[in-house]
Structure formats: C-alpha cells, structure tokens
C-alpha cells in the first residue's frame, strides 16, 4: 500500500514493479494499491531543484521532492500533482487507502508502516535548514497513512553504529570521521583477530594520497581573517564537507582501486558521492530516542563496530564479552531493548535477540 502522504515517481515505480515481478515471479501489480492523493514526483522537479543550486549549499540530494510537494500544495497543474489524476494511474489499483487501512485494522489485521529518512532530519525538530522536506517522526508516518496516533503501536527505531549523512554541506554531524579512518580501524580490529583486512591497505593509502593532491590545489579564500590553509579548512564556516573532498579524490584513482574501496565506502543513492560518516554520538542518539519513543531497537552495521563477524553472523550468534556492554549502553540511552542486530546486508546476517 502506498498511502496518501507518499510521493511517487511514476517512471521509477514502473521500473521497480517490473523488477520485483521478474525477480519473484509474482505480478506485484495485483497486490499494489496506491492512494489517489499520493503526490507525484517528475523529472522536472529534479531539474528545478538542481537548477536553483540550493541543494549544493544545503547538502540536499537534489532529487526534487520539495519541489514536488510545493506543487501539490499550490495545486499547480490542476490535478497533475496527485496520482489519481495522471495518465499512468490507469495501470495501477488506485483506491482510498485510508478506508482500506483502517478497515483492515478494524478486522484485526496488523499494519506495518515503514518510515523514511533519519529522525534527526525532521523539518520541525532537526537542524533546520539542514533537514528533509517533511516530518520523519512515527506520528507523522501514521498521519500520512490516515491512521490515528491513538492506535496501539510497536515502534522499532533503526540505529546505525556509524551514522551517515548525505554528501556535501549537509549540516552538523558530531564525531564525523573519514572513510579511510574508519577503514583502517576496521582492518586493525580484524588483524588483531587474525583475519584478513576488508580493504587492502594499499588502496587506502592511494586514496589518502589522492586527498592530499586535491587539498594541495586549494588556496585560502579571500576574507578568511588571515587564517592559514589548515586553520581555514577546520573552520566550519569555510569547510567543504569530507564527502565532497572524497568524491574529488576518487577521480585520481584507477578503477581497480575504486573497486577495492567500494567494499566499504558508502555512496549516495542518486549522486553517487561518498556519504559522510561519523561515530555514534550519545546526545544525538538520546534525542532521536526521545522523539521516537521506541518500543524496540534494530541495531544495524554491527559489523563496522565488530568486524570479526563481517557478513558472518547467523540467527544463533552469541554475543561476546565486548558486544554485550556495547548493546547494553545503547539500550540504556534509548530506554528500549535491542531486538535485532545486523552484521551484513542480508537476512542471514541478522541476529534476533530473545
């Protein structure tokens, strides 16, 4: 079910439906229901967003979701901005999902609602203007589906051991580190356990040398208060985000080195730039938990913190004497039990705690 508060890109939706149907052998269109009031996102919204250049100064993705929402609010295009009115709607089951979801709940069905983006990117409670275009809190997800927040809920908050942000000047990120730093730490932990490194050291060294090459091309900008280049770099007022530097440095490397680095480095979905990454910050985690009030926590990317279990965990995994204190500390901060722990991208890498 795609609810009334969702934003749908018709071309991407068609591609994903075809892909899912081909991979599963099931016709997903027979099960998919879309609310007629769901918003419509087109390529023109992306074009307008990137043309303004604001996504560079704010570190946004430039996908144009904000532009699409503005059009929906203004009613620009006389119906063009809601899914029920577009030509492609005839290919899908378009129905009032508010009635369907509430009807299913009244009949005893369990409803699973998936939220989008990070809690601390909320437009109202996040570090504005470095936020997304809407509220990302659990109550907002229910409202977008037409469900009352008074309904009984079981909120599962997803926590990354190393949080990420979109590339560019995307706002404050406490305890930010570089991917080479994280990679070296992961390799060192694995080597102490007698295991092979995740990324070859020569690739990391080449990447850091490329970063130095990029940095050497920078000059101190005017009106920088007499700072030398190192001091200027450290000032957030003039600082280019690490992800932008990393993206530029990648151009200096050959394809084999980039392929080696891609075993760990995470790219943004749309722009394919290196994401920003940071160590888990206690204050940020506490604030996110306060806003979500989770009943349970799903801890992801545990393989970054404990790389000796890189993609090797199974449902019968037993926590060792280092993992247990780490998990208990997160449970203390979030005031919620950790129910799921993932050590890799697949379901076979998920450890379910009793």
How should each PLM-predicted stretch be described?
Residues 1-354:
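Non-transmembrane, aqueous-exposed alpha-helical and coiled segments at domain scale
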């Amino acid at each position: 079910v795609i609810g009334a508060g969702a934003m749908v890109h018709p071309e991407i939706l068609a591609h994903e439906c075809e892909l899912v149907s081909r991979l599963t052998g099931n016709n997903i269109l027979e099960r998919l229901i879309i609310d007629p009031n769901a918003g419509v996102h087109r390529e023109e919204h992306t074009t307008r967003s990137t043309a303004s250049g604001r996504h560079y100064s704010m570190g946004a993705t430039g996908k144009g979701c904000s532009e699409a929402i503005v059009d929906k609010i203004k009613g620009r295009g006389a119906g063009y901005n809601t899914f029920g009115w577009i030509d492609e709607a005839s290919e899908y089951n378009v129905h009032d999902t508010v009635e369907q979801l509430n009807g299913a709940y009244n009949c005893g069905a369990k409803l699973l609602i998936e939220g989008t983006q990070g809690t601390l990117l909320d437009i109202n409670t996040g570090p504005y203007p470095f936020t997304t275009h809407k509220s990302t809190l659990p109550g907002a997800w229910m409202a977008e589906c037409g469900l009352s927040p008074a309904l009984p809920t079981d909120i599962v908050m997803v926590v990354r051991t190393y949080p990420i942000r979109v590339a560019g000047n995307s706002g404050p990120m406490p305890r930010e580190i570089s991917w080479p730093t994280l990679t070296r730490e992961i390799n060192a932990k694995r080597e102490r356990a007698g295991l092979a490194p995740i990324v070859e050291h020569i690739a990391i060294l080449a990447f850091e040398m490329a970063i130095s090459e990029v940095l050497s091309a920078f000059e101190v900008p005017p009106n920088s208060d007499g700072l030398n280049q190192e001091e200027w770099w450290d000032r957030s007022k003039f600082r280019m985000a690490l992800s932008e530097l990393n993206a530029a440095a990648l151009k200096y490397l050959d394809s084999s080195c980039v392929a080696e680095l891609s075993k760990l480095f995470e790219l943004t979905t749309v722009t394919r730039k290196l994401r920003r990454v940071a160590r888990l910050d206690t204050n940020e985690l506490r604030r996110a938990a306060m806003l979500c009030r989770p009943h349970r926590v799903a801890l992801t990317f545990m393989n970054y913190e404990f790389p000796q279990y890189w993609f090797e965990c199974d449902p019968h995994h037993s926590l060792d004497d280092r993992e247990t204190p780490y998990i208990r500390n997160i449970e203390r901060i979030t005031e919620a039990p950790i129910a799921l722990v993932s050590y890799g991208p697949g379901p076979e890498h998920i450890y379910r705690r009793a």
